[in-house]
């Protein structure tokens, strides 16, 4: 019998962090190993399970990323570009998996993540939803089939949305560009 994967949730106090912690709660193949938040975050010191709206998990939210990755198998990260870049470097040093759902990366950040990926498995997406990824396939094909049509991306978000354009909007722009064999800047 295999042991459960030990998961670090970075951005534990956010909406996606809560969702990941809740999803891990009743799994036999994965457990919450550590919960990370930024220095000064109101969630620090709280039990991650209770913070996510459930029973205690006896995993306090911490800001100590280095201690969190010790003996971890993977990091699931919904934080900020700066935090994701730092976590990618730690994942590379520890040779663990790093799943990045953060968005808003500068080109220099992307290069640092690519460098870290030489030593760690890194999975990065602006949106992990099955529906959105199916939409990307459809957008790519429509852009290829309808080159004479203009493409426009319009989005609306909740008031707490941290980045604009969103990772999903950028994914749509890349899908249009791929369908038309252009660069995203030319779309």
Question: Which positions does each model-derived feature cover?
Answer:
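Active-site-lining helix/loop region of Rossmann-like oxidoreductase modules
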Residues: 2-28, 41, 56, 143-187
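Short, ordered loop/turn segments at secondary-structure junctions
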Residues: 38, 103-105, 127-128, 156-159
């Amino acid at each position: 019998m295999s042991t459960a994967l030990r998961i670090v949730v970075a951005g534990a106090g956010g909406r996606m962090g809560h969702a990941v912690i809740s999803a891990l709660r009743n799994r036999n193949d994965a457990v919450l190993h550590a919960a990370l938040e930024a220095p000064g975050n109101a969630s620090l010191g709280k039990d991650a399970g209770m913070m996510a709206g459930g029973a205690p998990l006896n995993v306090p939210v911490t800001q100590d990323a280095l201690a969190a990755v010790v003996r971890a198998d993977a990091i699931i990260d919904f934080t900020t570009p700066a935090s994701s870049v730092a976590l990618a470097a730690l994942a590379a040093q520890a040779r663990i998996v790093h799943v990045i759902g953060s968005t808003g990366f500068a080109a220099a950040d992307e290069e640092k993540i690519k460098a870290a990926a030489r030593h760690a498995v890194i999975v990065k997406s602006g949106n992990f939803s099955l529906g959105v990824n199916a939409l990307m396939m459809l957008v790519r094909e429509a852009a290829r089939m309808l080159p004479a049509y203009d493409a426009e991306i319009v989005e609306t978000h909740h008031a707490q949305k941290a980045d604009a354009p969103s990772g999903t909007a950028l994914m749509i722009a890349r899908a249009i560009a791929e369908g038309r064999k252009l660069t995203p800047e030319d779309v």
